[in-house]
Amino acid sequence: MADLQLTDETPAVADDGVWLACIECGETFAPFAEIRYTCDDCDGLLEARYGDLPTFEDFEGEGVWRYNAALPFEVGVTLPEGHTPLHRVPRLEDEVGVDALRIKHEGMNPTGSFKDRGMTVGVRVAQEVGVDRLACASTGNTSAALAAYGARADLETLVLLPAGKVAAGKVAQA
């Protein structure tokens, strides 16, 4: 496996300080030059790498896009997502023996799922690489998120659901 520790060297393929690196052989690729899922050389998985990693001081604002310093774009296809509340759970704090436990209520996202957090970035990446149609096969939250974010991006979206295998609430959600 390749040594992927941070280095001072940013490869020539880097786009705005970001590149893809194979976790097996270390080969590097431009992040948006073409649609690529695995390494051309060894078929290994690719990892996003940064010349300079952002720090917490680089993050401001709310929602998913407050982390845009660590994302490939300033803003995505947004509904907006990620403005979900944290709830105190004093009884659970006592039970597990911690002083300040919070539970994030991801059901408050636009489609009722944490999947919105990834889909806002994913649909934006699809736009960047020139995709004009989106599709997924899912029985739940992914289908709802793709339907919503695909519609927001005005992209043709196809969601495949197995016959008789999806709860009515999930179909309505999508």
Predicted stretch roles:
Residues 2-174:
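PLP-dependent amino-acid enzyme catalytic core
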